[in-house]
Every structure is written in C-alpha cells, then in structure tokens.
From Swiss-Prot:
Molecular function terms, GO-annotated: microtubule binding
InterPro entries named among the record's database cross-references: Ska2, Ska2_N
Species assigned in the record: Rattus norvegicus (Rat)
Protein name (record): SKA complex subunit 2
Keyword Cell cycle: yes
Primary localisation category: cytoplasm
Keyword NAD: no
Amino acid sequence: MEAEVDKLELMFQKADSDLDYLQYRLEYEVKINHPHSAGEKNAVAILKELSAIKSRYQALCARFKTVSVEQKETKSCICAILNKTMTMLQELQKQTNLELTLLTEEEKAVTERLKSHVPDVENGILQRNFDGEKISSKEIQRGV
C-alpha cells in the first residue's frame, strides 16, 4: 500500500510540474503572439482559472498527505492491538491448558490474506496460534 501512496505522490508532483510549465507557456504565448489583441482578456482569465485550479490541487495534495499519515498510524495501532490480543490469547491457552483446533480451509485462506495485508503483524504469533500448535511460556515471554 505504501508503494501505491508513493506512486500517487509522484503522480501529483508531476502534475504540479506540468501545471507550472503550462502556465509559463501560456503566459509566454500570450505576450509574444497577442500583445494587443481582443482575445487577451480571455487568455488572462484562463490563466487566473489555472492558478485557482493549481491552488485547489495543492490543497488536495495537503489533505492527501494528512490522510496517508493517519492511515499509516491507524495501521500501526491495529497491528499493535492484534499482536497484544494474540499474546493474551496464548497466555489464556497456557493457563487453561487448551489448544486451538486446526483451522478450516476458509479460515486458513482468511489468515493468509490478513498476513499479506498486514505484514507488520508478528507472523510467529499468528502462524503458531492459527495452526493450533501449543506455545511454551518462554515463547510468550519473548513475544513470539
């Protein structure tokens, strides 16, 4: 997901650069080709609209960056909560001497999708818990 965010940021930067170039080129063309023509007011109005569009675009970029940062923070928080929950589950299993049953195919598929979407989650915790293997107290203390 971060690669997609970086790609979008690069696209926004390129679009910003393209807008700057277009504005410069239009101003140059108006000065050179139409110094006293009747169409000059229209060209100026277009340039003002281009500036307004650029301002709105920059505001959108700023909001996009804010959303991106918040999204990363939320993802980190979810991963931390999930890791803590899995550790608590392991401790509860240890205290009650219970083991998880093996997962169904559907549950395994969901687990794999979760791992692929949230790589920050400690795979050791998820793998061992979801596979139903018993975890020793030493592993729990190490946070595995």
